[in-house]
């Protein structure tokens, strides 16, 4: 029995305690610091950001990435976030966007009406104007006219996005 206890202590990786102590914010922050330093050594002028997701915000019972915008704001030039508004949840999606307001400009760098109607997406864009400095969406290299001619669902979705995008944020 004593040999078994000793063996289990020996086989337990020592790094587990270190990882448990460091996760998640310190590792995320150090990674961003190192990347920023490396970029700045070759390019002192380009803006630096990290793509954040809705689960970058700490919330009860929700997966958490460790890339907390409040912690990381000092390391980046602007906040960029991937947000896909969901049907009947536009208010919650705007509230999520508000969570990224940490004193830096916000760019919604990845968005698309993937999980909501065109009308809900337009509403999301309209209401996000008070928080976002810009928006970037998908473009797969096909024009609006090409997408309209196609009979593929993906092209219909892309056409809807391109129509909204070309009109501008309502």
Residue ranges and their predicted role:
Residues 1-2, 170:
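Accessible peptide chain termini
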Residues 2-142, 147, 157:
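Extracellular glycoside hydrolase catalytic/binding regions
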Residues 143-170:
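Extended, alpha-helix-rich binding/interface surfaces that flank or overlap catalytic cores
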């Amino acid at each position: 029995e004593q040999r078994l206890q000793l063996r289990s202590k020996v086989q337990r990786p020592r790094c587990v305690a270190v990882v448990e102590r460091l996760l998640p914010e310190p590792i995320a922050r150090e990674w961003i610091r190192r990347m920023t330093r490396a970029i700045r050594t070759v390019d002192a002028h380009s803006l630096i950001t990290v793509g954040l997701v809705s689960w970058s915000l700490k919330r009860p019972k929700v997966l958490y990435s460790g890339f907390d915008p409040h912690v990381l704001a000092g390391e980046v030039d602007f906040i960029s976030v991937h947000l896909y508004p969901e049907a009947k949840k536009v208010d919650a999606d705007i509230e999520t966007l508000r969570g990224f307001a940490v004193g830096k400009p916000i760019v919604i760098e990845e968005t698309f009406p993937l999980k909501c109607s065109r009308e809900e997406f337009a509403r999301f864009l309209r209401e996000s104007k008070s928080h976002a400095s810009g928006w970037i969406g998908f473009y797969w290299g096909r024009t609006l006219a090409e997408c309209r001619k196609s009979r593929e669902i993906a092209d219909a979705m892309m056409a809807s996005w391109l129509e909204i995008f070309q009109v501008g944020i309502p």
